[in-house]
Swiss-Prot record:
Organism encoding this protein: Mycoplasmopsis pulmonis (strain UAB CTIP)
PROSITE patterns: RIBOSOMAL_S12
Protein name: Small ribosomal subunit protein uS12
Gene Ontology molecular functions: rRNA binding; structural constituent of ribosome; tRNA binding
PANTHER family: 30S RIBOSOMAL PROTEIN S12 FAMILY MEMBER
Gene of this entry: rpsL
Family matches, as Pfam families: Ribosom_S12_S23
Keywords: Ribonucleoprotein, Ribosomal protein, RNA-binding, rRNA-binding, tRNA-binding
Chain coiled-coil ranges: none
Length: 137
């Protein structure tokens, strides 16, 4: 435990908060070849690999994910939500920071219904999350 004198001379250091989605917090300037700290809600990228992985212990499934090379040069793993998808290698996608609890290392989620990622077919509830159009009557 520090003495009062130590606290007066040095003081307490503020603990820096760690971001949950670091790839969204920097942009790349290709002209000057430098990274710039710039927070963004979404980032565009190109799929380099589309595959499945199994979740952590109590759950059992084959979760779809894509390895995405972002516009700032970073490569991240992003989850593909919803049932069925049309993504393949070289598909252009938009990602957001949304961690998947039972997939370790997956901190991002692909936004359905934008760029090359088509919306989920025959979806009636929570349609805006999955880029689904309203069903015709």
């Amino acid at each position: 435990m520090p003495t009062i004198n130590q606290l007066v001379t040095k003081g307490r250091k503020r603990k820096a908060s760690k971001t949950k989605s670091p790839a969204l917090n920097q942009s790349y300037n290709s002209l000057h070849k430098k990274y710039k700290k710039l927070s963004a809600p979404f980032k565009r990228g190109v799929c380099t690999r589309v595959a499945t992985m199994t979740p952590k212990k109590p759950n059992s499934a084959l979760r779809k994910y894509a390895r995405v090379k972002l516009s700032n040069g970073m490569e991240v793993t992003a989850y593909i939500p919803g049932e069925g998808h049309n993504l393949q290698e070289h598909s252009v996608v938009l990602i957001k920071g949304a961690s998947v609890k039972d997939l370790p290392g997956v901190r991002y989620s692909i936004i359905r219904g934008t760029q090359d990622a088509a919306g989920v077919n025959k979806r009636n509830q929570a349609r805006s999350r999955y880029g689904a159009k309203k069903a015709k009557k």
